[in-house]
Every structure is written in structure tokens, then in C-alpha cells.
């Protein structure tokens, strides 16, 4: 049997691995699936079609899988899917998806999600991200791997935040943030590259040189976005170690629908 506190309410039909622990007064709905090694804190609520992978730690009063805050929602059986080894701190709220998108809100693996973070319907959060206290993702936001979002930052609907990007405290993000960039403020502005983050992740100097050249093309040479993208196509010849990073950046820019922070 799972280690379930006697005051917790686990509905018939819920699927809990035998190694799951559930704290006092937690409420788990009939469609929840909770994988091995998960810890559900006191007073947590897990409802709807919510699936958690292995070894997630959910702190007290988090609410996962509630209906999307979308007036068009009419009770469709949408989902919230969370991967493995995530830390989800107190009072976080993650909503299920809507049928206007994929019907799915998804969160990957190894994310560090601090207190009071809100992840709205249809968001896609990658792996190894950090979302600091009170960060708020509106509907359909995409946050790529290893991005960092500062506390009290608000992210507009449909915005994409690229891999390795970093947003400072209390920023207002209404346009897409390209990979590797560091942004801050209200109004938001690019402050440079997230160099310290890249160094901590072991990026060698030769690879960093290619990323710096992409930054110059986007932000320091007065080029249009189209011209900067075309110029980037030539970078792998001079910076072969950054070829994958160039491909990542060009794919991100091609997929932008809200324009980028410039």
C-alpha cells in the first residue's frame, strides 16, 4: 500500500504507485496517476486527468490539474502531464489544457518550480528549467530547456522562451525571448547573453564565440530579423562547435509568432 495519511482523501480510481507518500488532508481525484517515489505534501489537490512520473516532490497546498481558466472550456477531458524529478513548491497552480490547443499542459523533467508559480492551460515547460516565486505563465506559453524565469515575472499568452534564456525579477514578457539571451525589465529589453549560465553548463570558449556572433547579428549590427537569420546560416563554417546552437536559434526565430524582444 502507498503511505497515505489517514486524513488524506484518495478517490476510487486514482492510480498511486506503492512507493507514493501522501500527506495530511491532501485530495487526489479519481483520474490521477502518480508514479513511483512521488511525495504529495499536506493539503495538496491533484485533480482531473493528471499524470505524474517518478520522484516528483510536491510541497503543501499545491493545486495540480484544475480546469483551465478559459471561458471557452466546456468540461472536455483534457490533461496535465508532469515528468520526473520535479520540485514543485508551496501553492503552485498548474491547469489542464484546452481543446483549442493540444488538450495538454506538459511539464518535463528535473524542473525547479518555486512557490506560487502559475502554469496556465496548454503551456509546455521543458527540462531543467527554474521558475522563481510567483512567476506566471499565461496560456499556451512555451519554456524551453534550461531557461530561468525570475520571481514575479509575467509571461503573455503564446510567448516562447528559448533554451538557456534568463528573465530577471519582475519582468513583463510579451514577445518571444530567443535562446541564450538575458532579458529584464518593464518594458522588457535584452541585456546581453546569459554568459554565466552558459559557463556553468560547461560551454567551451569556441562554442561561446559562435553564440556571441549570433548575438551581434541580432542586436548590434542594425540588421533586420530576416537579414540576421540569413547571416547566421554562414556561421557554422567559422564556428563549427556552435553549429547546433545556430540551428537551434534559426529554428526558434522561424517559429516566432509574436516577434522577438529587441
From Swiss-Prot:
Gene Ontology cellular component? cytoplasm; membrane
Q: Record's superkingdom?
A: Bacteria
| Catalyzed reactions per annotation | a (3R)-hydroxyacyl-[ACP] + UDP-N-acetyl-alpha-D-glucosamine = a UDP-3-O-[(3R)-3-hydroxyacyl]-N-acetyl-alpha-D-glucosamine + holo-[ACP]
The listed locations are:
Cytoplasm
Output the Gene Ontology terms for molecular function: acyl-[acyl-carrier-protein]-UDP-N-acetylglucosamine O-acyltransferase activity
Query: What pathway, per the record?
Result: Glycolipid biosynthesis; lipid IV(A) biosynthesis; lipid IV(A) from (3R)-3-hydroxytetradecanoyl-[acyl-carrier-protein] and UDP-N-acetyl-alpha-D-glucosamine: step 1/6
**Per the UniProt record, which EC number(s) apply here?**
2.3.1.129
Which GO terms are recorded in the biological process aspect for this UniProt protein?
lipid A biosynthetic process
What Pfam families does the annotation carry? Acetyltransf_11, Hexapep
Q: Which UniProt keywords apply?
A: Acyltransferase, Cytoplasm, Lipid A biosynthesis, Lipid biosynthesis, Lipid metabolism, Repeat, Transferase
Say what the protein does.
Answer: Involved in the biosynthesis of lipid A, a phosphorylated glycolipid that anchors the lipopolysaccharide to the outer membrane of the cell.
User: What family does the entry list?
Assistant: Belongs to the transferase hexapeptide repeat family. LpxA subfamily.
Q: How does it assemble?
A: Homotrimer.
Q: Which PANTHER family match?
A: ACYL-[ACYL-CARRIER-PROTEIN]--UDP-N-ACETYLGLUCOSAMINE O-ACYLTRANSFERASE (PTHR43480), ACYL-[ACYL-CARRIER-PROTEIN]--UDP-N-ACETYLGLUCOSAMINE O-ACYLTRANSFERASE, MITOCHONDRIAL-RELATED (PTHR43480:SF1)
Official protein name in the record: Acyl-[acyl-carrier-protein]--UDP-N-acetylglucosamine O-acyltransferase
Amino acid at each position: 500500500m502507498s503511505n497515505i495519511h489517514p486524513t488524506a482523501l484518495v478517490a476510487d480510481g486514482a492510480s498511486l504507485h506503492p512507493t507514493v507518500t501522501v500527506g495530511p488532508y491532501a485530495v487526489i481525484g479519481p483520474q490521477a496517476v502518480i508514479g513511483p517515489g512521488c511525495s504529495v505534501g499536506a493539503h495538496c489537490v491533484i485533480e482531473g486527468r493528471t499524470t505524474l512520473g517518478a520522484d516528483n516532490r510536491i510541497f503543501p497546498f499545491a493545486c495540480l490539474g484544475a480546469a483551465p481558466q478559459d471561458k471557452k472550456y466546456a468540461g472536455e477531458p483534457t490533461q496535465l502531464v508532469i515528468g520526473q524529478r520535479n520540485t514543485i513548491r508551496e501553492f503552485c497552480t498548474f491547469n489542464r489544457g484546452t481543446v483549442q490547443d493540444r488538450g495538454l499542459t506538459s511539464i518535463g523533467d528535473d524542473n525547479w518550480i518555486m512557490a506560487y508559480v502559475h502554469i496556465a492551460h496548454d503551456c509546455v515547460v521543458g527540462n531543467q528549467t527554474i521558475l522563481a516565486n510567483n512567476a506566471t505563465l499565461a496560456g499556451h506559453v512555451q519554456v524551453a530547456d534550461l531557461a530561468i524565469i525570475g520571481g514575479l515575472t509575467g509571461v503573455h499568452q503564446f510567448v516562447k522562451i528559448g533554451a538557456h534564456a534568463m528573465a530577471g525579477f519582475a519582468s513583463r514578457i510579451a514577445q518571444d525571448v530567443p535562446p541564450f539571451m538575458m532579458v529584464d525589465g518593464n518594458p522588457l529589453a535584452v541585456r546581453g547573453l546569459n554568459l554565466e549560465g552558459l559557463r556553468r553548463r560547461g560551454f567551451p570558449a569556441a562554442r561561446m564565440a559562435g553564440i556571441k556572433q549570433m548575438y551581434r547579428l541580432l542586436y548590434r549590427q542594425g540588421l533586420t530579423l530576416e537579414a540576421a537569420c540569413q547571416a547566421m546560416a554562414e556561421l557554422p563554417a567559422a564556428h563549427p562547435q556552435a553549429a547546433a546552437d545556430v540551428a537551434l536559434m534559426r529554428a526558434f526565430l522561424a517559429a516566432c509568432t509574436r516577434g522577438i524582444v529587441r
